[in-house]
Amino acid sequence: KERMRSLYAEYGGATLEAVSRMLLEQAEQLIRERLRELPDGTWRARQYVDMPGGLYRVELAATKEDATLTYDFTGTDPQLDLGINCFYWATWGALFAPVFPLLAWDIPWNEGITRLFRLIAPEGTLVNSRRPAPVSIATTGIVQVVNNLSVLVLSKMLGATDKYRERATAVWHGSHVSVNLNGLNADGEFFVTNLTDSFAGAGGARATRDGVNIGGEIPNVVSRWANAETQEAHTPMIYLYRRPV
């Protein structure tokens, strides 16, 4: 906020708005050129979520035509009475998290990139649930699945051209194992906590090299697990060790 105020004070609103529009147009043009370097076609991927009651499918087809990329979730299972569902805009965000590092690593990350993408997400499904569908754990549920599918179809598309084949990657951090604990501590007080150890993440293998054991996730290449001392200070837990398994 203070930095924006200082920019307005130095350059004025008209100049900042003009520069902002220019940056959006620049990003749009650059991603258009990048998409046109890639072959037209349709790439598909699907994942299943194992929940009480069965396996539930999320289906994605990505169709690239000239400089437009359409994501189509037709075939995805209906929403559930469980909190893993996504609203439309959560799905949109999960799709774009891999788009920026995989397609736009050298392009300013702003709204201009999104202008060439289309989303088909049938209402009432896991990726576009109707209110009042529960969505409290969407981030570790369908958001993660959509993120994975986006990585898969983009990597298949990149793998279809010699120029960008080496940028294709397997899924990073394929699932969030969200472990929730509650009970009584040594003083008889109720506690509840969420363990984020699985958030350490892992890097998927590339076309020419192995993956990495601990590497965060593709839109955020940093491990985000809470440190052991913090968990021990606030919960009746003691860590004996932390190590990859």
Predicted regions, residues:
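Glycine/proline-enriched, intrinsically flexible loops and inter-domain linkers
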Residues: 1-245
